[in-house]
């Protein structure tokens, strides 16, 4: 009986982690809890800038979208809600820089900030609902696991802990101690939370109990987050090396050293059926065979790539610090389309059916679509 209960619970955790976004919403950083950045919908054939709005302040945050509303933060500490036709609905002032994407869970928008506080506000009014305090800044996005009638919001902090709180009350459920800062967002798939940190360890945690099941010693800062697919975690480190790790067997399947030009990996891979795509501070977007790490193609831009790409079955969408938004062919890396935003972009795209949204570092939200 215990075996069958475990199988059912694993199914619930897996289904919940994959059901966080549909074609018309992007409620989490990277769209889904696995952080894989894959969408089923098509990108516009010839994207047009539909509108843009200057929101004040600079930002490294990325947008999320639910029910016709776009949410993001900025360095002034503002959490901003904008309708998908470009109207500001409300602002919540936290008083501390919001460096990562917020997340939407139910009727709440949940985000961390540089004062080390995880906050939940009402997504309609922006009213504060609860707050949870860690002992240092929160630089990454929160994520959520759901199992039956249980759920938890997980976020890493520079206090060396991964924290899990009740989404309704903000009360602590558990926390896991590491040996250095946690800069990225934890990924969730198949009943596992997987995250890295500046201690150079990739860690696997049980979401229900907070028990740390496995650690894989990478030996170099992991400044970003893994993307998960099946039993595999794909990620890069601060030295520019890219990895595929089997989190079930704790084996490194392949690793690709960084280029001679140097450059850290600050973004998260986008994981397709047979390939992964990842950008680097060396100005290249790389595409590798996901099974063996063979380089399939690379595309050079004119600036660092700090954000994370999004892909579908045929195309790759990404941004660069050169101020451009790009769409490439997934099969060959050839450029299909680009747009010059005129200012650096370090955030990652949010994609909904027929549209995508980009946030520039000078605080402009750009909406693209077919017409």
Residue ranges of predicted features:
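Sec-dependent N-terminal signal peptides
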Residues: 4-13
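Beta-propeller domains
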Residues: 74-84
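Boundary at the C-terminal end of the N-terminal hydrophobic targeting segment
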Residues: 17-21
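Extracytoplasmic beta-rich repeat domains
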Residues: 22-23, 30-33, 45, 51-64, ...
């Amino acid at each position: 009986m215990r075996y069958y209960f475990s199988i059912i619970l694993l199914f619930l955790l897996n289904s919940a982690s994959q059901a966080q976004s549909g074609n018309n919403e992007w409620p989490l950083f990277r769209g889904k809890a696995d952080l894989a950045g894959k969408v089923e919908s098509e990108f516009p054939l010839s994207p047009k800038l539909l509108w843009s709005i200057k929101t004040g302040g600079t930002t490294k945050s990325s947008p999320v979208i639910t029910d016709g509303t776009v949410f993001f933060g900025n360095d002034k500490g503002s959490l901003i809600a904008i309708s998908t036709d470009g109207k500001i609905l409300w602002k919540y002032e936290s008083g501390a820089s919001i460096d990562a994407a917020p997340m939407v869970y139910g009727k709440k928008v949940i985000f961390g900030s540089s004062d080390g506080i995880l906050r939940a506000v009402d997504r309609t009014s922006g009213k504060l609902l609860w707050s949870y305090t860690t002992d240092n800044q929160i630089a990454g996005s929160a994520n959520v696991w759901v199992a039956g009638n249980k759920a938890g919001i997980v976020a890493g902090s520079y206090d060396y802990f991964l924290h899990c709180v009740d989404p309704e009350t903000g009360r602590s459920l558990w926390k896991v101690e590491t040996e250095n800062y946690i800069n990225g967002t934890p990924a969730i798939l198949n009943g596992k939370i997987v995250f890295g940190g500046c201690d150079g360890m990739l860690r696997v945690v049980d979401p229900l109990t907070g028990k740390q099941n496995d650690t894989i010693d990478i030996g170099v800062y992991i400044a970003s987050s893994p993307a998960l697919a099946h039993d595999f975690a794909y990620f890069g480190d601060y030295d520019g090396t890219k990895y595929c790790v089997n989190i079930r067997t704790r084996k490194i399947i392949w690793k690709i050293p960084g280029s001679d030009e140097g450059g850290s990996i600050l973004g998260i891979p986008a994981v397709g059926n047979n390939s992964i795509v990842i950008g680097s501070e060396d100005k290249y977007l790389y595409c590798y065979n996901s099974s063996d790490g063979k380089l399939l193609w690379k595309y050079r831009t004119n600036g660092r790539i700090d954000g994370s790409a999004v892909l579908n079955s045929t195309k790759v969408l990404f941004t660069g610090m050169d101020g451009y938004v790009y769409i490439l062919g997934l099969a060959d890396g050839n450029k299909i389309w680009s747009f010059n935003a005129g200012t650096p972009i370090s955030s990652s795209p949010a994609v909904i059916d027929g549209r995508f949204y980009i946030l520039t570092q000078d605080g402009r939200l750009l909406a693209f679509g077919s017409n």
